[in-house]
A protein has these predicted regions:
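Flexible, solvent-exposed coil segments and beta strand-coil junctions
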Residues: 4-15, 67-79, 158-168
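Flexible, surface-exposed loop regions and adjacent strand-edge segments
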Residues: 2-12, 61-71, 121, 126-136
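Flexible glycine-rich, low-complexity coil/linker segments exposed to the extracellular/periplasmic environment
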Residues: 73-74, 124-175
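Outer-membrane beta-barrel transmembrane strands
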Residues: 1, 17-60, 78-127, 162-191
Length: 191
């Protein structure tokens, strides 16, 4: 994705260029089985298992800003971000049912079951910006040039621009969610 916008802020023209590449992947696997044993009180056994993995990577998002034709010195105006996210989920479920025939033509059907679910998430973001540091960073003839001519290895020095990390503590996290459940019920049908 490439985006350029023009805007008016306090009477000056603003140009924001954003370059973004995002990779997404989803893998899902499921197995299930249904088993019926009519000679054993109509016993039914159902099971299911699933695994899902989803990933999102944005390896080098770039956002650059020019204010009134000059390379912007705003902290949020010149950024490079590296993002990675991975979600995993797995679930196992078991269900059992039997039929019993009672007095007065009643059918008693007990059902029991079990579910185990586990979900994890791992998110990592690294943020970098360019600090205006020395005389090169204040040279107007340099700041009006295209980005490829401003941020060259010769200009990323103590006399020009410094790369600084802007990653926040909340940009990286891990999360887990585990659930284990049992259920039981009885259904009685009167004929």
């Amino acid at each position: 994705v490439f985006r350029t916008t023009g805007d008016t802020e306090a009477g000056s023209e603003v140009e924001i260029n954003e370059i973004q590449w995002v990779e997404r992947e989803l893998a899902s696997h499921q197995l299930q089985g249904d088993h019926f044993f009519p000679s054993f009180n109509e016993f039914v056994f159902n099971w299911r298992y699933s695994e899902i993995t989803a990933t999102r990577e944005a390896p080098d998002n770039r956002l650059y800003r020019y204010d009134a034709g000059e390379f912007s010195s705003r902290v949020d105006g010149n950024l490079r971000n590296f993002d990675a996210l991975e979600d995993n989920a797995s679930e196992l479920g078991l269900d059992f049912t039997m039929a019993f025939y009672g007095p007065l033509n009643t059918i008693i059907t007990p059902k029991v079951g079990y579910v185990s679910s586990e979900k994890t998430r791992d998110s990592e973001i690294r943020r970098f910006g360019f600090a205006f540091n020395g005389p090169l960073a204040n040279d107007i003839s340099l700041l009006v040039k295209p980005l490829e001519e401003i941020l060259t290895p010769e200009n990323i020095t103590e006399q020009g621009f410094l790369i600084r990390e802007l990653t926040r503590p909340t940009d990286n996290y891990k999360a887990n969610n585990n659930l284990e459940a049992f259920y039981g019920q009885v259904e009685v049908n009167f004929d």
